[in-house]
Amino acid sequence: TVMNNIPLVFWLIPIASVVALGMAWFFFRSMMKEEEGTDRMKEIAEHVRKGAMAYLKQQYKVVAIVFVVLAIVFAFMAYVLKVQNPWVPFAFLTGGLFSGLAGFFGMKTATYASARTANGARTGLDKGLKIAFRSGAVMGLVVVGLGLLDIAIWFIVLNAVYQGESTALVTITTTMLTFGMGASTQALFARVGGGIYTKAADVGADLVGKVEANIPEDDPRNPATIADNVGDNVGDVAGMGADLYESYCGSILSTAALGATAFAMNGDMQLRAVIAPMIIAAIGIFLSLIGIFMVRTREGATMKELLHSLGLGTNVSACLIAVATFVILYMLGIENWLGLSFSVISGLVAGVVIGQATEYYTSHSYVPTQKIAEASQTGPATVIIKGIGTGMISTMIPVVTISVAIMLSYFCANGFDMSLSAKSISTGLYGIGIAAVGMLSTLGITLATDAYGPIADNAGGNAEMSGLGKEVRERTDALDALGNTTAATGKGFAIGSAALTALALLASYIEEIKIAMIRAVENGKQYIDSAGNVFDPSNASTIDFIEFFQVNLINPKVLVGAFLGAMAAFLFCGLTMGAVGRAAESMVQEVRRQFREIKGILEGKATPDYGRCVEISTRSAQREMILPSLLAIIIPIVVGLVLGVAGVLGLLTGGLAAGFTLAVFMSNSGGAWDNAKKMIEEGHYGGKGSENHKATIVGDTVGDPFKDTSGPSLNILIKLMSMVSIVMAGLTIAFL
């Protein structure tokens, strides 16, 4: 009996993942049955689809090479140097494969859905909303379905292998944690590559089209429009999906590892603590589906009503999971189930608060963005100053929220035990992990609202280029404006969840170090602590490790690590900004060349060469993403080898603090500039084509790489540095 120790309730996990994938397939089929519209609409959708698929193909080629190289490195570390778990090379590959699949399915759906959404909007607003939202739901469900499936399969396999060993669960969870490396690497390329692609096209299209040639957005005369629309899919669907896939898996796996440690003394409780985060995620899938079916609206709905219908689905799912958590943890019989349930709720609430705060600072219904639009009366410089100021101030609420969530989830979990005993710390850390899982448990629907944005955006582009009637444009505009708000709150949510996940990963880093040291001791190594006694890693607590490695602020290694972490965040940002700048320059030159050399583009008589622009974006993105990506992987390895465990913990703390605040600042500045421009386009302060409008276009163009490249890429950086440290723990220990 291989499965005799797995409780029956565990099977909810694979069942939920299969249900999610089944429903995703159902939504995909029902979307494909809808009409795609006129021949012109079909033709434009085909252009975008080809471009998106060409990009994915190219990107996956590069990623495949990187994966093969890394898998060989891991295999060498595991089988030759024996400093790595032997399962890692395989787990790493499945993590990457599943994440890549999720991106592929999400993107395929989005590119098929845009024309159908535009066509649906010809009949009515509700029809358009449903097609776009349910197509977005395909992405959300595929991510949670594949993520949980990967986790469930590996848990069953490893459990069968290690069953009966005294440290079985610690070994299983620390092994599973390293698959996160596959999801992380995939996410890095999808987010950074996608971010560079989409903004090279967007900035190029805006600068030449709107500012120089005075043609509106999404005009078929602009050669970069198709690339711009492809970019929405590449960055916001595939990139966002891979980012949240990584947070989702990372939070569940690190929490399982923390649970194995927190309850190590009690075998039965330990197993329950390990599968608890997986079960919360599984129940979250069922509850997300309820929310997805609740999203609908009426004709002529106002923006407020539209937002309400999307918000209703998300909030109902969140409230249901809050209630369900109490039931799940009580039925699992986990000690202090009540406190842990409040940990989950603190994560859920933090997600909502950060989303709302993001909306406040970036939506033009509120003062901060209105003030930026007002500043356009004195030219672009004041618009930039105001936007940067707004972004910086906007970091306060998310940072305070995450801080409160950390404190609450930690102390609720350990029953407000202020003593720093080993038990209270490990239980508290488990609580923080559980909060991250809570925040991400309704990912099925929150990601659906995110992926909805680019689908609606592309539908608007399609309607504009196909020359559909005015009332259709008004409907797609309403859907698109809604999409921009959900995209902003979605970004806030992605950043918040990345921060909590990174924190849980940071906490589980010590577990990986512990396992690595036990492995080294088995191979005949002996550790002596500062007092000259033999240090035995196998029954040492988290505190003992912190003392053994002298992880405190008086240790210069920790301080230097923290400085390097903060610097890494800025360096990474700078590199991605520079990459967008360079890629946009080559795009601008290409668009100018076409206007010069292809006669009759501006009169609408000749068709521009869209393919060239798509190619430029694809090539730049591939070339430019290598350096920042390598940096993220190399820095933690070098710090581990030079400064040891203390240095790495400093690096991860500094990187998390700087990366989180920087990401919020960049995301919100960019979002506010974008919406200030939209506010003027709606007719305030002089309207379209005025000098004020041009000033806000400058702001929006600066904001593009802020909010869509550098900001979101930081989510990956803070998780990836923790992930790399975890995977390289064995190497760090070998050089002790």
Mark where each language-model region is:
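Hydrophobic packing and interface segments
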Residues: 2-736
